[in-house]
Amino acid sequence: DASAGRGDLASYAFDETSGGTFADASGRGLTATLRRTWGGPSHPGFLAAYPETQFIDLESRTTSDYTKVWAPYYTAHKILRGVLDAYLTTEDARALDLASGMCDWMYARLSKLPEATLQRMWGLFSSGEFGGIVEAICDLHAITGKAEHLALARLFDLDRLIDNAAANTDILDGLHANQHIPIFTGYLRLYDATGEQHYLDAARNFWGMVVPHRMYGIGGTSTGEFWKARDVIAGTISDTTAETCCAYNMLKLSRTLFFHEQQPKYMDYYERALYNQVLGSKQDRADAEKPLVTYFIGLTPGHVRDYTPKQGTTCCEGTGMESATKYQDSVYFKAADGSALYVNLYSPSQLNWTEKGVTVTQTTAFPREQSTTLTVGGGSAAFALRLRVPAWATAGFRVTVNGRAVSGTPTPGSYFTVSRTWRSGDKVRISMPFRLRVEKALDDPSLQTLFYGPVNLVGRSSATSHLQLGLYRNAGLSGDLLPSLTPVSGKPLHHTLAGTEFAPFFEGTEDPTHAYFKRSEPRVIFGNSDSGVANPAKSDGTTLLDEIWAGAPFSSKGALVTRVRSTVNAWVAAGRLSGADGQKVVRTAEQATYAP
């Protein structure tokens, strides 16, 4: 089913003479046969899920109509990726022959078209969508070395998109999201093949147009498959936000960018999208017939995830199944010169680093555990261990080697490096305490989403309007908001607040959820002591309490009271707070009792 994006043909057998068959594991008697089609209507190598008329129609079409032409090159990518992966997995030359033949056919066709026709085709919504075909063609070119294959990859250049992205000009408003995200992964592969800087610049700048400017808290992007204006988050939330394919392709792009620039922001995003949207897109039950993955993940109040989309078979079912095979593929990276090992994700895994003759075994229940242990096995080797310090790990990140603390100051959103000659049995223990925090919608600071470390917490409630929640009432001197929540016994990462249970977004249930809530702090309260004073706000929505707690962590109660007094004085001077109310606020802060 190519339209579902099931680009996974590695288990098919190939036989040009009698045909290879693959037995249907479901027992329904369906088999698969795939062989090279030398008798294509226009050129050898034609292999598609459509007749050639679909490709011809696309070339003459000036407007999109996916009921007549539905993305023939998108489907070609799925087939090409599948047969290419079959070759990479099995080294069966017949699979490579299929892939090469497909690209020979595409080059013979597309190279004859005027540039204006190509630009018009690739700019058409849906009909001109081609997914990750450029990446796949570049992968093939790396094997065959055929100049025609590299030239073919460049025939998919969408000049308006490349030029604007390379210049860091944001033109994403109104574009179909998943039609364009994988294009930039292809541009990175073209940069690898050609060294042309504008491809790298375009991909890097594009990523920055999505993260954070069009990103929901779970790492997803798009609403109704399309992007809206930059920095509009609250204004785009709907039942059709966060198409699952978009998260899949943003992970691929982030991973590929990291190959070129080892910036921790790419892996911070990777962790966010993987541990929230991607894990949460799969229902937590088995099914022999259906993949049970989401198409959209609605972020409206009380939304119930649909794991069997009413739209029928979707692209997201295919990428959803692929995602389940890729949980491990960005945990570790080695430096190009072999001098360092990057630990990007904290996930139970084992790395066999053959060049160094060592293994690294990671033992953890992260994110249900706030630590992990790396154990070196095999021989001994000298290298730098670069441990990602997540951007959310703002306090308490600690590393020990064989029980001894490693000196240094870990900086959130960076790598903490431990260099030594490693020997079998060495143990590296990493502790990273989680803190409760909020992230605010860029266009409405009162609309917020809740995180505990890397984990997005969602309220389970059938209410169809946003929950109204306050979090400052029991905030501790550290600024951690966690004391405002009550843990649920026997259910890791579950808490209650104001009578509502909050659970990890990644749990694939059919509970109605609230990913966003309305922040409501109507009165100034410290340590559960109510001053009786209304919590005033500036024109941008920032409240008095927001400004006070922005100074956290506080070394002592006295430091907090000093912050309260100086903030109150500024607000009184600005006419936002009366002198009498200001005195009440300071007095309440002085009398309250605080958690650490």
In which residue ranges do the predicted regions lie?
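Solvent-exposed beta-strand/loop surfaces of large extracellular or lumenal domains
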Residues: 394-419, 438-443
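Extracytoplasmic low-complexity segments
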Residues: 1-40
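Well-ordered alpha-helical segments within folded domains of soluble proteins
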Residues: 71-87, 126-141, 175-192, 240-258, ...
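Soluble extracellular-acting proteins and domains
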Residues: 522-596
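Extended ligand-binding groove/face enriched in aromatic
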Residues: 37-155
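C-terminal beta-rich recognition modules with glycine/proline-rich loops and embedded aromatic residues
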Residues: 203, 267-283, 287-375, 411, ...
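Long, well-ordered core segments of solenoidal/helical folds
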Residues: 37-45, 58, 97-114, 148-168, ...
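Carbohydrate-binding/catalytic loop surfaces
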Residues: 45-70, 119-138, 167-189, 220-243, ...
